[in-house]
UniProtKB/Swiss-Prot annotation:
Gene3D superfamilies: Pseudouridine synthase
Molecular-function GO terms, alphabetical: RNA binding; tRNA pseudouridine(55) synthase activity
CDD domains found in the cross-reference section: PseudoU_synth_EcTruB
Name of this chain's protein: tRNA pseudouridine synthase B
One GO term (biological process): mRNA pseudouridine synthesis
EC number: 5.4.99.25
Active-site residues (renumbered): D38 (nucleophile)
Higher taxonomy: Bacteria, Pseudomonadati, Thermodesulfobacteriota, Syntrophia, Syntrophales
Presence of the UniProt keyword Glycosyltransferase in the record: no
Record's keyword terms, sorted: Isomerase, tRNA processing
Function: Responsible for synthesis of pseudouridine from uracil-55 in the psi GC loop of transfer RNAs.
Pfam annotation, one family: TruB_N
Family affiliation: Belongs to the pseudouridine synthase TruB family. Type 1 subfamily.
Gene from which this protein is expressed: truB
Origin: domain of life: Bacteria
């Protein structure tokens, strides 16, 4: 079983724990997830099975979309409702101020990784240092918040929908919004609605998998490797070239000119497919596609990033 299964994660388990359970239930040899969800969080968690685990490095780069609820007036050491409370303040806010705060944290913003997170320092996740009482301050990172839409105010709770780049911590965003509002805040609910092109509409629950009911229906939900990178341009190649690439060949301009090449800029990613739709490789173009005709003969036109042995 090679492919991607979109899971609607339940609260209470780590993403890695979910992966281990899916491996056991489905009997797959390898599995991995793209985009960690905290135990508190629910929603879209792409699970990559067997050969599809090679796609994790690409799927993890995708933008995300969430629905979050924050509790105003309460600050915790973990920035979510499960952590030890460190401060309480009365939230004296209105809709205008809340909308202003959401707008303030839209666009490129700077975030420090939470002390209780899976980000590694000296090979160990930050939460392991924090539990030992060691406070590690990592440099801030710039992330992108594309939109923050207010959905509901039921003080002290505020619910909003946010679309953002990879690496954005919604816990940190809630805490920063609380400080902007002058009362502090922590995240109380988080649901991921989208990860790249994957949404809840195609998701299954762990309970669906564990029940074993409708196994054929479940297997029909497994997304082929070639569909895992839907936003990446595709080039269909011959079986002969597929074999050469899988043996380590880096195609040059003269080789690629034999095929239909979509419009690509220098640095764009591309996926090579067989005529039957099997994923051969993911590569990065070293020239714009309109420069292939004048590229150095015999010099690679792409850099192969990952090779796949897709049985499609």
């Amino acid at each position: 079983m090679d492919g991607i299964l979109i899971l609607d994660k339940s609260p209470g388990k780590t993403s890695q724990k979910v992966v281990q359970e899916v491996k056991r239930i489905l009997g797959v040899r390898k599995a991995g997830h793209a985009g960690t969800l905290d135990p508190l969080a629910t929603g879209v968690l792409p699970l990559c099975l067997n050969e599809a685990t090679k796609l994790v490095q690409f799927l993890s780069l995708d933008d995300k979309e969430y629905r979050a609820t924050m509790l105003l007036g309460v600050t915790t050491e973990t920035m979510d409702i499960e952590g030890r409370i460190t401060d309480r303040r009365e939230p004296e806010v209105d809709e205008v101020r809340i909308r202003e705060a959401l707008q303030f944290f839209t666009g490129p913003i700077s975030q420090e990784p939470p002390r209780y997170s899976a980000v590694k320092f000296k090979g160990r996740p930050l939460y392991s240092w924090a539990r030992k009482g060691v406070d590690i301050a990592l440099p801030p990172r710039t992330v992108q918040v594309y939109s923050s839409i207010l959905e509901e105010i039921a003080l002290p709770y505020v619910t909003f929908r946010v679309a953002c780049s990879k690496g954005t911590y919604i816990r940190t965003l809630c805490a920063d919004l609380g400080e902007r509002l002058g009362c502090g805040a922590c995240m109380s609910v988080l649901r991921r609605l989208r990860c790249g092109c994957f949404t809840l509409e195609t998701a299954v629950s762990l309970e669906d998998i564990a029940d074993g009911k409708g196994r054929e229906t479940l297997l029909s939900r497994v997304i082929p490797l070639s569909d895992g990178l839907r936003n990446v341009a595709a080039i269909e190649i011959s079986e002969e070239l597929s074999g050469r690439i899988r043996d380590g060949f880096q195609p040059d301009g003269s080789t690629l000119r034999e095929y239909h090449i979509p419009s690509l800029a220098d640095g764009d990613m591309v996926k090579f497919l067989t005529s039957s739709g099997g994923l051969v490789a993911v590569a990065r173009f070293l020239y714009a596609s309109d420069q292939l005709a004048v590229s150095d003969m015999g010099q690679p036109a792409v850099r192969i990033l990952r090779v796949f042995h897709d049985r499609a």
